[in-house]
């Protein structure tokens, strides 16, 4: 099963594509969609087109996207919601089912600790996917979103259905203890 994870943002939208087979996670692609300094409609169009292109190029079976959190600044929350909406439209226009997860669910599923830092997310994603280099924070969050969806058990045949991430970590000689990855 191929999963496309999206970390929405108005300026930078992260994406990550993984393949899931049993307890195995395999990296396919990751990166960011950068919007130009332009009016809101142009930026939202760039996000929609970018996500639509990813769906065509990578042919995922399912998608996962981060839910909007309520920020102190309501204007920022509204803009993030619009960026997220453009990304969801790109996913749905490609016929994908879309799952939504909170930042807390993402961090708990990937790192084992709901208040994990960006660097902890990057490190865990790097280890889980056997990457040679560490992805940027937006791409790492998007890859983490795909891993979270695989772990959720809501994907048929995904790693979350039987045993969660523990077997995948154990194969690498790793485990999570007090929110930290240890050997």
Swiss-Prot record:
It comes from the Bacteria. It comes from Burkholderia ambifaria (strain MC40-6). The keyword Nuclease applies. It holds the Pfam family RuvC. The keyword DNA repair applies. Mg(2+) 1 binds at residues 7, 138. Keywords: Cytoplasm, DNA damage, DNA recombination, DNA repair, DNA-binding, Endonuclease, Hydrolase, Magnesium, Metal-binding, Nuclease. Its main location: cytoplasm. It is an enzyme of class 3 (hydrolase). The active site is at residues 7, 66, 138. PROSITE patterns: RUVC. It is found in: Cytoplasm. Its cofactor is Mg(2+). This is Crossover junction endodeoxyribonuclease RuvC. Its EC number is 3.1.21.10. It catalyses: Endonucleolytic cleavage at a junction such as a reciprocal single-stranded crossover between two homologous DNA duplexes (Holliday junction). One of its GO terms (cellular component) is Holliday junction resolvase complex. GO terms for molecular function: crossover junction DNA endonuclease activity; DNA binding; magnesium ion binding.
């Amino acid at each position: 099963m191929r999963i496309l994870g999206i970390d929405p943002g108005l300026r930078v939208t992260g994406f990550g594509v993984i393949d899931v087979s049993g307890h195995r996670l395999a990296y396919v692609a990751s990166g960011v969609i950068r919007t130009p300094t332009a009016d809101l409609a142009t930026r939202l169009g760039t996000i929609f087109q970018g996500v639509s292109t990813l769906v065509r190029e990578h042919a995922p079976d399912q998608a996962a996207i981060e839910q909007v959190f309520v920020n102190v600044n309501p204007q920022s929350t509204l803009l993030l919601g619009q960026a997220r909406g453009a990304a969801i439209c790109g996913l749905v226009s490609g016929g994908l089912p879309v799952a939504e997860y909170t930042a807390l669910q993402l961090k708990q599923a990937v790192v084992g600790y709901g208040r994990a830092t960006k660097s902890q997310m990057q490190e865990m994603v790097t280890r889980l996917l056997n990457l040679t280099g560490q992805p940027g924070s937006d791409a790492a969050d998007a890859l983490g979103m795909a891993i979270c969806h695989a772990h959720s058990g809501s994907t048929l045949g995904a790693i979350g259905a039987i045993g969660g991430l523990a077997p995948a970590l154990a194969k690498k000689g790793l485990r999570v203890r007090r929110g930290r990855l240890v050997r």
